[in-house]
């Protein structure tokens, strides 16, 4: 079985779109389509139902997804097992658009000679298990579990408190505000279709919404970042929430606005997760770099979820 085709299938399943999977994998959309078609031919079943706006898993696709992920993890472990001491440091950043990727890129710029492999895993449970088994060396995550509930040998440390911002189109009532308080968001429609039950980012925004009496809508399929920006640009009612360091690019005509939140400033708590006893020399270098470059946000005007701790 072609593992590149399996990897492509998993990417499309996660993104819900061939185009977004192509961007994540760094290949053309045509290459993604060919790989999926070859895999479907090899398996003798259709894995996706194509629609004008994306791709939905068929029943067979849903059945194939868990073992496909297991297969890729097994491949990762096999490759790592034959490169002790010489292999690249493997770090999960969730997505290349968000703050963890910037943190890792900053380390790469400071240590350009250190081999790195950027990994993108979906949920914290998968990431922690990958760290535990040695499939990856580290992961950037918001850690919702207390230390006593983490697997033996798993270590975490806070590396970034990232301010959350309001994202609106030019016609929104808050678009012209230089900053607003979380309480001022009450009554406004906040749309975040990427929130998935059970994920750490959903836990963060659920608690944030509850703390300030906000209503967060998750309706509609998640077609990715670009369709979200398109909707916000043309809406006078919908807004969304994003991290300050989330990398977003939109056409000039969209005129989207990023509005700071204050009094208090909600911050998303990014932590680095690794396994005690991991002797990869670059892991220690990464930890030292993150400690030395962590912004000082010791401010009473910050808000974090109760599970985030200090």
How does the language model describe each region?
Residues 148-162, 177-178, 249-261:
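Ligand-binding "clamshell"
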Residues 38-57:
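A short LG(V/I)-centered, amphipathic sequence patch enriched
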